[in-house]
Amino acid sequence: MAEFHFFCIDAHTCGNPVRVVTGGSIPFLQGNSMSEKRQHFLREFDWIRKGLMFEPRGHDMMSGSILYPPTDPANDAGVLFIETSGCLPMCGHGTIGTVTVAIEQNLIRPKTPGVLNLEVPAGLVRAEYQQEGKKVTSVKITNIKSYLAAEKLTVDCPDLGLLTVDVAYGGNFYAIVDPQPNFPGLEHYKAEQLIGWARVMRERMNEQYTFVHPENPTINGLSHILWTGKPIAETSTARNAVFYGDKAIDRSPCGTGTSARMAQWYAQGRLKPGETFVHESIIGSIFNGRIEAETELANQPAIVPSIEGWARIHGYNHLILDEEDPYVFGFQVI
């Protein structure tokens, strides 16, 4: 029976976990892009994600990344995102945490000091980081093109009734639930209620509607529900609680969710290029967002968003997936 060893550095980005896999039994992935490599990972190696993210080695909110060499030598690295919800096309909080870990631990030598160009399954992202001594104090990501995919869709939600939502893409597809007669705002509910409702809503929306990236059909399906509400701090623009996986609410403001919400606000005329979008999480942590440019995606209006936040390292792991362990591939209790 085989054992597979993985060397990981654990961090959190504004409260949400990031487990960066730095070495060990990292599989070779075929493909000319991180999108193609993601497909290979999903076909043959998703057991690694489950083993490292699910219990007993992980938990309901666990999220992480695996570092790879870039497919284009002009870039600094490739990143594959793994979490309880799947192998994601893009993860904003994960990128901030990965960059922090990579720079502080000397895992990547940047071609340009202060900048990392990262290949991710959703495309190419640029990360600019600030340092004080050996510490990375902030990371700003210029994300992939984001857009409002659908407006005023309806879905029946348990307990709440019929809800109207917009769906936007910021690296993943998000159903955005704004305050309305049947939902006055996230501040009126407990996290466990939002989680239970969101799980049913996501299933129903994927049954009722189809969501496919216009240029990359491997990016498809609604994966996240973004509940909105009144900010805690007067300096915040907006607040959200993002549901992912089967039992998780993002403790960070969610990078791809922030990108999706800025795309929604842009389409509604509520946010203009250059304006700051201070996005607050369920625990009050902050991402500073901004529209860097207006653009198009498959002839649809879109934006190039940026998100800035911080991360901290808090541990080192040598994790073992032992085939003699009945829970080698993890489990969830739902």
Swiss-Prot record:
**What is catalysed by this protein?**
trans-4-hydroxy-L-proline = cis-4-hydroxy-D-proline
Indicate which residues the UniProt annotation says bind substrate: G92, H93, H224, D250, G255, T256
Q: What is its EC number?
A: 5.1.1.8
Alphabetically list the UniProt keywords.
Isomerase
One Pfam family name is: Pro_racemase
Gene Ontology terms, MF aspect: 4-hydroxyproline epimerase activity
| Record-annotated active site | C91 (proton acceptor), C254 (proton donor)
On the tree of life, the source organism's domain of life is Bacteria
Role played: Catalyzes the epimerization of trans-4-hydroxy-L-proline (t4LHyp) to cis-4-hydroxy-D-proline (c4DHyp). Is likely involved in a degradation pathway that converts t4LHyp to alpha-ketoglutarate. Displays no proline racemase activity.
Family the UniProt entry places it in: Belongs to the proline racemase family.
NCBIfam families attached to this UniProt entry: PRK13971.1 (NF010578)
Q: What PANTHER family does UniProt report for this protein, alphabetically?
A: BIFUNCTIONAL TRANS-3-HYDROXY-L-PROLINE DEHYDRATASE_2-EPIMERASE, TRANS-3-HYDROXY-L-PROLINE DEHYDRATASE
Please give the name of this protein: 4-hydroxyproline 2-epimerase
What is the organism field in this record? Spirosoma linguale (strain ATCC 33905 / DSM 74 / LMG 10896 / Claus 1)
